């Protein structure tokens, strides 16, 4: 399996790939299982295992990639495709670059879509101390859970009511939700889900009025320290591959926090019949 390092391409054993995917997949499952029933019914939120993969769909929001995709060890692409056909949304599968699964979906006529780059780092390594413009980083208070949900929903382009999906994660077991505060107001957030000896950094969101103040750099550093305190062996995070060869702000923040790119995960999309 090809791995894109800072200066070279090496081969990653499948076992290592699965090790680095495990915290994200566990967090993904837990987050979807936490969706309130009323919201799940309203938007057609469904998650299941099919064909060896973790499959999620939002029938009411078919155009949102973040809510309609399959991840994990895809062993039976046909079974994965049947899941999406049943939900009435296009199939989007995230597969390791250069893998047998990627070749299988390409053979089914799928088209390559956007890709996510996976990054990893050892939480025991030195952690940068990013500067923030007057922001304080601390755990999200229970009273700010609703605000956290609002920020996450807005950041991912989701309907406002789906903030009620993410808000309970602030106090849910396994989740460590941190916030950047301007005085007493929560203006940015980021979470760490701990599982399988690793941590998945996710749900990064910043109020647009407070961008450029170093919030996400500080939140990444704080989550690395949480992972260290928990005794985790690695922290992983992902972001979209550069468009036009120009890394975005998220990519640059991740590198500054000491993460290294470890593998690319392309998404492949089914084509209309």
PLM region descriptions:
Residues 87-88, 151-161:
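Helix-loop element at the rim of GNAT/NAT acetyltransferase active sites that forms part
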Residues 8, 72-136, 141, 234-237, ...:
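Acyl-donor-binding surface of acyltransferase catalytic domains
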Residues 61-69, 113, 194-202, 211:
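A conserved beta-turn-beta hairpin within the catalytic core of GNAT-like acetyltransferases
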Residues 40-49, 88-90, 113-115, 169-179, ...:
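A short helix-loop-beta-strand connector motif used in the catalytic cores of GNAT acetyltransferases and
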Residues 2-86:
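N-terminal charged segments
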Residues 46-52, 97, 103-108, 174-188:
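Conserved beta-hairpin
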Residues 159-208:
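A conserved beta-strand-loop-helix scaffold within acyl/acetyltransferase catalytic domains
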Residues 76-81, 203-206, 212-229, 252, ...:
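Conserved acetyl-CoA-binding loop-helix of GNAT-fold acetyltransferases
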């Amino acid at each position: 399996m090809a791995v894109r390092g800072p200066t070279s391409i090496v081969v990653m054993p499948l076992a290592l790939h699965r090790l680095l995917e495990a915290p994200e997949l566990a967090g993904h499952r837990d987050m979807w299982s936490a969706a309130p029933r009323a919201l799940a019914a309203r938007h057609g939120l469904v998650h299941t295992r099919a064909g060896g993969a973790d499959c999620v769909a939002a029938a009411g929001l078919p155009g949102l990639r973040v809510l309609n995709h399959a991840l994990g060890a895809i062993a039976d692409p046909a079974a994965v495709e049947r899941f999406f056909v049943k939900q009435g949304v296009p199939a989007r599968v995230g597969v390791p670059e250069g893998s047998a699964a990627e070749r299988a979906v390409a053979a089914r006529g799928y088209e390559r879509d956007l890709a996510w780059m996976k990054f990893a780092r050892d939480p025991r390594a030195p952690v940068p101390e990013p500067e923030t413009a007057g922001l304080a980083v601390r755990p999200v208070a229970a009273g700010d859970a609703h605000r956290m949900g609002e920020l996450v929903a807005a950041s991912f382009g989701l309907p406002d009511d789906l903030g009620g999906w993410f808000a309970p994660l602030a106090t849910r077991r396994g989740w460590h939700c941190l916030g950047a505060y301007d005085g007493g107001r929560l203006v940015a957030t980021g979470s760490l889900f701990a599982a399988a000896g690793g941590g998945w950094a996710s749900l990064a969101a910043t109020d647009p009025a407070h961008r450029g103040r170093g919030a996400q750099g500080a939140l990444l550093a704080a989550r690395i320290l949480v992972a260290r305190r928990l005794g985790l062996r690695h922290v992983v995070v992902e972001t979209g591959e550069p468009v036009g060869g120009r890394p975005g702000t998220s990519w640059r923040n991740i590198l500054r926090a000491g993460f290294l790119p470890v593998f690319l995960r392309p998404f492949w999309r089914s084509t209309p019949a």
